[in-house]
Amino acid sequence: MSATAPIRIAARAQPAKYAFIIFHGLGDSGAGWTFLAEYLQRDPALASAQFVFPTAPVRPITANNFAPATAWLDVRSWLSHESVDLEGFNESMKLVPKLIEEQVAQGIPYERIWIGGFSQGAALTMGTALSFPHRLGGFLSFSGPPSYRWLEHTVSDANTGAPVFQSHGTMDEVFPSSGAEAVHRSFTSQYGFKNHRLKIYDGLGHSISPQLLDDALAFIKANLDAEKPAPRPAL
């Protein structure tokens, strides 16, 4: 399974101060998500953000009669999400720290690197939130899986204070919105995430919407420098 080189979009305002690494969903590509950079960079607060859009390797998809598609992990069934391709997931997860360290080498601190993804890409995003050993800037999870119980052995508390924006549609035909609510409960109650916002969109399917993008932008702007401690009051 050969991989396509990630698409990299430079910050409009240099030097770059922030970085976003965005993972696509099944059958998509990094190119399919470059619109997000264009949208976010329009805002002056994110003009100094640079973006990385990786593309998953092509692999046979079991649930699709082994037809090949770009995927971060195999899909074994469209009807059940309990059987997870851990081997494929863990292999794809190896890419995440490499991309993060590339940004650090370019002068972007961990605390200003955001990870995001859609569907399978959301699984990588939340897997990173649970396992990465350094505090990151934040996480964007769009239409992700209904459970991360299979990741419990990898849990780190380094990012429990990082901001998480999780979105889901009530008409999602792949992952029901009830699963999103369960994920939110587990991240806040079981794993101790303190700034985890779940936004459910009425009538939205396994997709994103203009309102969702506006909400994500507002959340990002409100949390861009969340790693900075509040200033002490003057004595």
UniProtKB/Swiss-Prot annotation:
Keywords of the record: Cytoplasm, Fatty acid metabolism, Hydrolase, Lipid metabolism, Nucleus, Serine esterase
Broad class of where this protein is predominantly found: cytoplasm
Active site annotation, chain numbering: S119, D172, H206
GO-annotated cellular components: cytoplasm; nucleus
Catalyzed reaction equations: S-hexadecanoyl-L-cysteinyl-[protein] + H2O = L-cysteinyl-[protein] + hexadecanoate + H(+)
Record's subcellular location: Cytoplasm; Nucleus
Catalytic activity, EC: 3.1.2.-, 3.1.2.22
GO biological processes: fatty acid metabolic process
Cited InterPro entries: AB_hydrolase_fold (IPR029058), LYPA1-2/EST-like (IPR050565), PLipase/COase/thioEstase (IPR003140)
Superkingdom of origin organism: Eukaryota
GO MF: carboxylic ester hydrolase activity; palmitoyl-(protein) hydrolase activity
Pfam family, one: Abhydrolase_2
Position of the signal peptide: none
Described function: Hydrolyzes fatty acids from S-acylated cysteine residues in proteins with a strong preference for palmitoylated G-alpha proteins over other acyl substrates. Mediates the deacylation of G-alpha proteins such as GPA1 in vivo, but has weak or no activity toward palmitoylated Ras proteins. Has weak lysophospholipase activity in vitro; however such activity may not exist in vivo.
Family: Belongs to the AB hydrolase superfamily. AB hydrolase 2 family.
Protein name as catalogued: Acyl-protein thioesterase 1
Species, as recorded: Eremothecium gossypii (strain ATCC 10895 / CBS 109.51 / FGSC 9923 / NRRL Y-1056) (Yeast)
